[in-house]
Amino acid sequence: MGNMPKDFLWGGALAAHQFEGGWNQGGKGPSVVDVMTAGAHGVPRKITDTIEENEFYPNHEAIDFYHRYKEDIALFAEMGLKCLRTSIGWSRIFPKGDEAEPNEAGLQFYDDVFDELLKHGIEPVITLSHFEMPLHLAREYGGFRNRKVVDFFVNFAEACFTRYKDKVKYWMTFNEINNQMDVNNPLFLWTNSGVVVGENENAKEVMYQTAHHELVASALAVAKGKDINPEFQIGAMVSHVPIYPFSSNPEDVMLAEEEMRQRYFFPDVQVRGYYPSYALKEFEREGYNITFEDGDDEILRNGTVDYLGFSYYMSTTVKSDVKNDNTGDIVNGGLPNGVENPYITSSDWGWAIDPTGLRYTLNRFYDRYQIPLFIVENGFGAVDTLEEDGKVHDPERIQYLKSHIEALKKAVTYDGVDLIGYTPWGIIDIVSFTTGEMKKRYGMIYVDRDNEGNGSMKRYKKDSFEWYKNVIQTNGEEL
């Protein structure tokens, strides 16, 4: 195989709400995640009406990057990161979301963080909305089901683009915008969009109306960003779990093809600038009444993205003659026809380990869209043990990352995919999004904090730290 591009961005990925802490400091308002309690594997997180005294909210303090950012960025620099993907906490900039003017203390915090990154030669890659909508917009406006929230988001995007136009080049509008396709789990519509579905509402219809507003908001933000700095690279970001047919039975093959439309819907609109015909047919068939305003077509057309960012953790498989009752089961990918793939193994959390699926995904996306791609999440969640000598041995994580880097290298050097970079998820241990746990760790830096919020917060390098440092130094030559 040939060499990786010299300017390939090896990095790490995080989200403000999962690692910053300082949830009510510097003028920050509460976000939709600040009312989410701790859960566990198989125990869903609760969304409370207010901040309740007897509940534990793990994101409030998280790993306290808010006060430790210099120390943490120094560790990222020691690892040799070329970029750091993180997000700007929306409610840090607009505490309620509907203010006319941004919160200066919040803006200054990100100035300090970006300056510190750039001082160490680390390029910031920034997500505008990573499950951090101001709680006020969700409670008072109904989140993105309300068209007014489009304007609030664009106002927030403009404030960020203007303030950081000389510090940030790579942006993404919404993180994993397609998570909310899973309407069976209320966590996703709430965190993606600040939306709660009423008892008598059609969840899918609510989701598509909400999605339309977000797609319009994304397109308006892209156009606004290009006005502010034409050099900006503004991308979309989706969660991607490729779906394989269980067999060569044509029914299985066609079912996988149909199910993949759920995966492609959002990027189809954000990359191409118009609704795919299969989606319009679905609205018609199901009788969904989605309100499109005059001019929306033009907005979508004029706000297409420059690149596609995506998360990849696993693949899933479907079989046409199977019907699952438990669509919440991760093994079947939450799909009614999902089955276990006999050719691949799974992690302790039931996530299929499939590096070839990453190469497959890169090829499918690149064939479909012909724009640069960016792997902005990938990684291995596991329970790690801090030894008495301060070491953490994580050979499974190294093996997982190694096999996935081999797959992406092949996609670039053999298949010819245009790939901007690779940012493994949770480069330092953070609060898990789905469960609120600390126990499920992705990092190459261990943080001494447990599920109940106890611990010294001290940072320790895992074995994977030195391993990844060498991968970056050799531009992926030595795995």
UniProtKB/Swiss-Prot annotation:
Protein name: Aryl-phospho-beta-D-glucosidase BglA
Record keyword ATP-binding present: no
Entry similarity comment: Belongs to the glycosyl hydrolase 1 family.
GO terms, molecular function: 6-phospho-beta-glucosidase activity; beta-glucosidase activity
GO CC annotations on file: cytosol
Organism, as annotated: Bacillus subtilis (strain 168)
Catalytic activity reported: 6-phospho-beta-D-glucosyl-(1->4)-D-glucose + H2O = D-glucose 6-phosphate + D-glucose
Secretion signal, residue range per the UniProt entry: none
InterPro entries linked: Glyco_hydro_1, Glyco_hydro_1_AS, Glyco_hydro_1_N_CS, Glycoside_hydrolase_SF
EC supergroup of this enzyme: hydrolase
Keywords: Carbohydrate metabolism, Glycosidase, Hydrolase
EC identifiers of the protein: 3.2.1.86
Upregulation: Up-regulated by the aryl-beta-D-glucoside salicin.
Summary of the function given for this chain in its UniProt record: Catalyzes the hydrolysis of aryl-phospho-beta-D-glucosides such as 4-methylumbelliferyl-phospho-beta-D-glucopyranoside (MUG-P), phosphoarbutin and phosphosalicin. Plays a major role in the utilization of arbutin or salicin as the sole carbon source. BglA and BglH are the major proteins contributing to hydrolysis of MUG-P by extracts of late-exponential-phase or stationary-phase B.subtilis cells.
Catalytic site positions: 176 (proton donor), 377 (nucleophile)
Keyword flag Membrane: no
UniProt-listed NCBIfam families: PRK09589.1, PRK15014.1
Matches recorded under PROSITE patterns: GLYCOSYL_HYDROL_F1_1, GLYCOSYL_HYDROL_F1_2
GO biological processes: carbohydrate catabolic process
Pfam families reported for this sequence: Glyco_hydro_1
Superkingdom field: Bacteria
